[in-house]
């Protein structure tokens, strides 16, 4: 007979309303009315401006801001705040990935306006109370319920045009959320179950997307996994992996999802001996012998980037990155050790497989 042990824990459910299903972007009007809003500012990126325009079309008093960009630069937030003042917007609707959602959160932080978010990637930011903003060349992250969207609409049809390379990187980013939830200091049985399900769902969906990129079933499963992974991250603290990715992205302007894709297996290998139960859960979800090799092999099989050099990070930047990572490091199963982290960053820069030994 299998025995189970449950220790003391704290579980706080997130307050966002989640709507999931194909075609559910049609619910935006009803959700606006439910929130008592009529003048939305729709935020998106330049590349997804047409999606924003289509979303704005039915609303007489909607306005559009399409300058969202990576890592939520404060200068962009200031311009969007000016647009809110000019149009007297009473809510924010974000359509897009982490750039659009990050800007929406930044606006909510400054204004307390309600948010409706329609994700088009698997980043998961839409269900976390976490915001990262870049000022003076450094990305700073904080956790506050003020940035949680009131409504999240997962419409799988919005992900069908997501290019394969971005689908892969974004999906691995979502897996990273779930992985870190499994060894978070404040983890609990609920988030651990959700995290393992997220990893398993994404590990099944991403190869299917790589084979048939317009598969509704595969895209739906990936979106489901991304929701679970993001939700886990929203409920527990971030670890070393997210600290490193925020440092690398904010300092060297590296693409967010791709940086996660490169670093994930390396950080898991770094933490392996200190988090054996998490390693077992990850390997079980991946159907592999060990967690770090399974994650590396998955990324490699999907054609994901494997080196920081390929993303544009200079080798000379490793020292500066290490200094920033060691400063105010997040809670992590294994304490940050400068020598071991340097070796890890060097291997990640070169695109070598992860290694558990110092």
Name each region found by the language model.
Residues 1-90, 308:
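ATP/NTP phosphate-donor binding region
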């Amino acid at each position: 007979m299998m025995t189970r042990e449950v220790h003391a824990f704290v579980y706080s459910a997130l307050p966002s309303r989640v709507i999931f299903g194909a075609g559910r972007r049609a619910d935006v009007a009803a959700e606006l009315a439910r929130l008592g809003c009529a003048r939305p500012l729709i935020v998106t990126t330049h590349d997804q401006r047409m999606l924003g325009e289509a979303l704005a079309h039915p609303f007489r008093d909607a306005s559009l801001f399409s300058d969202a960009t990576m890592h939520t630069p404060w200068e962009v937030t200031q311009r969007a705040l000016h647009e809110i003042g000019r149009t007297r917007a009473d809510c924010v609707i974000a359509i897009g990935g982490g750039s659009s959602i990050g800007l929406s959160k930044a606006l909510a932080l400054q204004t307390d306006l309600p948010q409706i978010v329609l994700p088009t990637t698997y980043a998961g930011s839409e269900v976390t109370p976490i915001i990262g903003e870049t000022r003076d060349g450094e990305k700073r992250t904080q956790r506050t319920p003020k940035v949680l969207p009131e409504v999240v609409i997962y419409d799988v049809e919005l992900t069908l045009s997501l290019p394969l390379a971005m689908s892969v990187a974004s999906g691995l980013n979502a897996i990273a959320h779930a992985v870190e939830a499994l060894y978070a200091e404040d983890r609990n049985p609920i988030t651990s179950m959700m995290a393992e399900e997220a990893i398993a769902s994404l590990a099944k969906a991403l190869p299917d997307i790589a084979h048939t990129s317009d598969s509704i079933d595969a895209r739906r499963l990936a979106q489901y996994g991304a929701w679970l992974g993001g939700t886990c991250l929203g409920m527990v603290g971030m670890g070393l992996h997210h600290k490193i990715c925020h440092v690398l992205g904010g300092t060297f302007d590296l693409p967010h999802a791709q940086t996660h894709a490169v670093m994930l297996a390396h950080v898991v290998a770094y933490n392996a001996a200190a988090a054996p139960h998490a390693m077992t859960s990850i390997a079980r979800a991946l159907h592999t012998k060990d967690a770090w090799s399974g994650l590396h092999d998955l990324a490699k099989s999907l054609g994901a980037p494997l080196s920081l050099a390929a993303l544009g990070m200079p080798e000379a930047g490793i020292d500066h990155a290490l200094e920033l990572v060691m400063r105010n490091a997040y809670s992590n199963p294994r304490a940050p050790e400068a020598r071991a982290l340097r070796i890890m960053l060097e291997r990640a820069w070169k695109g070598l497989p992860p290694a558990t030994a110092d």
